[in-house]
A protein has these predicted regions:
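Short secondary-structure boundary segments
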Residues: 29, 69, 101-103
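Short, flexible loop segments at the rims of nucleotide/cofactor-binding pockets, characterized by
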Residues: 49-50, 75-78, 114-116
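A short acidic, often aromatic-flanked loop/helix-cap motif at beta-alpha or helix-coil junctions
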Residues: 55-60, 144-147
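Short, solvent-exposed loop/turn segments at secondary-structure junctions
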Residues: 32, 71-72, 105, 144
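Glycine-rich P-loop/Walker A and Walker A-like loops and their local beta1-loop-alpha1 context
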Residues: 20-53
């Protein structure tokens, strides 16, 4: 049931509550416990996750638990146009997604141009997804800190 907030003259219900949208984003470094925390908080099993390291190109658009979006980006997204299509499709087709992605922009900047482009695309995609997500959780040492 959506929470109804009211003022003196009007009632307000957020659009995400009306449409049943509830996207959550978990970000953090490699091996920090993002998947385990997401499963616990959302009553999911690890076996339910779409593992992006070896998933099909279309799998993430129907999966409720997307693990390793950075792997998907490395495998399938190579341009700004593909980035925009990915973001648009995820927003339109997967309104209940739990998205888990490693932070790949920290550390030494790679010499290889493709690696730099991959890191930039991943960062830009995650920035856009976080803007419209209902929750964004940063995970460090298995502990989630809500940043949105």
């Amino acid at each position: 049931m959506p929470e109804i907030r009211h003022s003196l003259y009007r009632f307000e219900i957020s659009q995400s509550e009306i449409m049943g949208v509830s996207v959550k984003v978990y970000i953090g470094g490699a091996n920090q416990g993002k998947l385990d925390l997401a499963c616990i908080e959302n009553h999911k099993r690890v076996e339910e996750a779409c593992i992006c390291e070896n998933c099909g190109r279309e799998d993430i658009f129907s999966a409720k638990l997307i693990y390793g979006l950075h792997h998907y980006i490395r495998r399938f997204v190579f341009s700004e146009e593909e980035k925009d299509i990915l973001i648009e499709r995820l927003r339109a087709e997967n309104t209940q997604a739990i998205i888990i992605c490693d932070e790949v922009g920290c550390g030494v900047v790679p010499i290889d141009k493709r690696e730099r482009e991959y890191r930039e695309l991943t960062g830009r995609i995650m920035t856009e997804l976080a803007k419209t997500a209902d929750e964004v959780i940063r995970v460090f040492c298995g502990i989630g800190g809500r940043i949105k």
